[in-house]
Each structure stands twice: as C-alpha cells, then as structure tokens.
Amino acid sequence: KDIPGYANLINLDYLKPLNEVLTRDTGDFNGTIEQLTTDDGNFYAVPFRSDFWVLYYNKDLFDKAGVEYPSNDLTMEDYDALARKMTSGSGDTKVYGCHYHTWRSAASLFSILDGKNTIIDGKYDFMKPTYDMVIAQQKDGICMDYGYLKTSSLHYSAAFENQQCAMVNMGSWFISTLEAYMKDAETKFNWGIVKYPH
C-alpha cells in the first residue's frame, strides 16, 4: 500500500508493467501516471482514488485541556510540542498526544512533504529527524509504542474513536469512517482536521 512496498514487489518481479495494458490516453490522470513511472520507464499501478493526509484532532480533548486547536501551519516542532502538551493521565485513562498507525507512511510521510526528498532512490538519511522525534515520543509516552500496536492490532480508528489520542495523522478516507462512527456512537465527540505538519 505504499511506495517501498510496491518497489519491493517490483524488484521481486511480482508486479508486471502496465504500459501495454493501459493503451488509452492517460491525460485524465492529471500527471499521476508520470509520478508512478519508475526509473525504467514503466508504471505498475494506476490511481484509483485521490486521497491526501491530514491531521485529525479531538476538539473536546483540546477544550478540556485548555489548549488551542492545531493550526494549518504547524511545523514539526510545533506538532511535537502540542502532542507533548496534550498527553495526560495514565493506565486505562491515559490520553496520548498523538498516534501513529503501524504503516511505514504514518511516520515517513512527514519527511517527504517538502518535495525535496524521495524514498525511491534508496537514500533515507533525511528521515532521521522524523524517526528520532517519533522514537522520542514513544520513549516519553507521548504516543503508543509500535510494538504494542502491532501485537494488540489496535487500529488507528479505534484509538481515535475511543478518545485514546488527541491527534492522529491519517488520510482523507478516514473522514467518512468518522462520520459513520459518530452517527451511532454512544460517546460522541467533536473533531476537526488541519493541514499536515511541515
């Protein structure tokens, strides 16, 4: 479901190029085919929807903490500070300031938003500051531990819907999930979205 995963499948020869299969004009993909084209001139996937990542936040938790909502211009430093400020409690009542799902992209995406870096070329040192931040947040109890998330199979939607975290970075597809959840939820809460931190 992400570029490194696709790249690995291509390298293992599990995916075949679609260049000869998709012979119609691809102009209506608005440049996405070009973005999906690999160094060898082939493309192995076609876009099926257009999603983007945003930062979801629980307005009620922010109100309760007396903390201003996230802005549309959060730097990574602002985001980290806000997550730390929003972390409270312990045990079953702990609220984590932020949450990262177990997908690679939940952490690595922060590193490529500036458009200056790519994960295609195999050089990943530019991701170190992001991973250092996430690992520090785990050690400090600001976000749930990756190992715990993997072994418990806790889904990002459950963490956010159960109000276990104040913020979660996730794709726009989560909007419809949240709306559906809120229709029948016993405990409803107010939530919002802002642009991804940079």
Segments and roles (model prediction):
Residues D2-F52, V194:
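Hinge/lid segment of periplasmic solute-binding proteins
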Residues K1, N162-M170:
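Alpha-to-beta junction loops
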Residues Y44-A45, T87-H101:
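Bilobed periplasmic-binding protein-like "clamshell/Venus-flytrap" ligand-binding domains
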Residues N42, A65, D140, K183-H198:
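Extracytoplasmic/periplasmic substrate-recognition and gating elements
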Residues W53-Y57:
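Short glycine- and hydrophobic/aromatic-rich loop-to-beta-strand nucleating segment
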Residues I3-P4, L74-D80, G147-E161:
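Short helix-initiation/N-cap motifs at beta->coil->alpha
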Residues Y6-I10, S172-T187:
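A ligand-binding cleft/hinge motif common to bilobed small-molecule-binding domains
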Residues A83-R84, I119-K150, Y196:
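Glycine-centered hinge/linker elements that transmit conformational signals in sensory
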